[in-house]
Swiss-Prot record:
Bias-annotated ranges (Basic and acidic residues): 154-178
Name of the gene: MEOX1
Region feature Disordered, mapped onto this chain: 86-178, 227-254
Subcellular location: Nucleus; Cytoplasm
The protein, known as: Homeobox protein MOX-1
Taxonomy, superkingdom: Eukaryota
GO CC terms in record: chromatin; cytoplasm; nucleus
Residue ranges of the TM segments: none
DNA-binding span(s): 171-230
Keyword tags: Activator, Cytoplasm, Developmental protein, DNA-binding, Homeobox, Nucleus, Repressor, Transcription, Transcription regulation
GO biological process: hematopoietic stem cell differentiation; regulation of transcription by RNA polymerase II; sclerotome development; somite development; somite specification
Length: 254
């Protein structure tokens, strides 16, 4: 603060000519009321610098002491306060409006920053929230589950397809479809001879339009059935099938 201004604030009763310079010359007629009169001019500490420049240009002879106010020009509450505390310096109420004026423009950016912060938070929340992340994770989990289920189904189908041809091929190899005529001729030959020579097996295969292997397999199965039913013993003394000697030329069925 300027030393001249501080000296003016400390002097509670400045001389009358100093205060008269700030009073309006038209206020003499209204002095009978006894009430303190404020100058009509908008001269105060809260005006802009351009107004202060015009005021100093209009009153070039004023000193810094003219800017101080007497207790008579203060409001009633402040006048009472000065009477109760004559030696106490002036309260800093003069500077409150200035500080308020300084705080108001500063509060704008702070409020703006808060609003911007909230708006930015809102933008962040709107652009990407935890719900979207969870939704994306859930969709990926569902896709992985679907893929795993498809792979399992494909593997099971492949295993089934692999098992079917093997079973069917075994069934085809084990069973041979014979006609009634073929079965009749084979049964008649088995009634006369339980074992066939290689030459006789060849003749039967040619007559019945079969292969030697098919004829051999049929006679082997028929002998096994006859043994289970009759409980007969093998005819050959060595207990070996006579056809086994000729089986070297033809592949065995088992």
């Amino acid at each position: 603060m300027d030393p001249a201004a501080s000296s003016c604030m400390r002097s509670l009763q400045p001389p009358a000519p100093v205060w008269g310079c700030l009073r309006n010359p038209h206020s003499e007629g209204n002095g009978a009321s006894g009430l303190p009169h404020y100058p009509p001019t908008p001269f105060s500490f809260h005006q802009k610098p351009d107004f202060l420049a015009t005021a100093t240009a209009a009153y070039p002879d004023f000193s810094a002491s003219c800017l101080a106010a007497t207790p008579h020009s203060l409001p009633q509450e402040e006048h009472i306060f000065t009477e109760q505390h004559p030696a106490f310096p002036q309260s800093p109420n003069w500077h409150f409006p200035v500080s308020d004026a300084r705080r108001r423009p500063n509060s704008g950016p702070a409020g703006g920053s808060k609003e911007m912060g909230t708006s930015s938070l809102g933008l962040v929340d709107t652009t990407g929230g935890p719900g979207d992340d969870y939704g994306v994770l859930g969709s990926t989990a569902n896709e992985t589950e679907k893929k795993s289920s498809r792979r399992r189904k494909e593997s099971s189908d492949n295993q089934e397809n692999r098992g079917k041809p093997e079973g069917s091929s075994k069934a085809r190899k084990e069973r041979t479809a014979f006609t009634k005529e073929q079965l009749r001729e084979l049964e008649a030959e088995f009634a006369h001879h339980n074992y066939l020579t290689r030459l006789r097996r060849y003749e039967i295969a040619v007559n019945l339009d079969l292969s030697e292997r098919q004829v051999k397999v049929w006679f082997q199965n028929r002998r096994m059935k006859w043994k289970r039913v009759k409980g007969g013993q093998p005819i050959s003394p060595n207990g070996q099938d006579p056809e086994d000697g000729d089986s070297t030329a033809s592949p065995s069925s088992e």
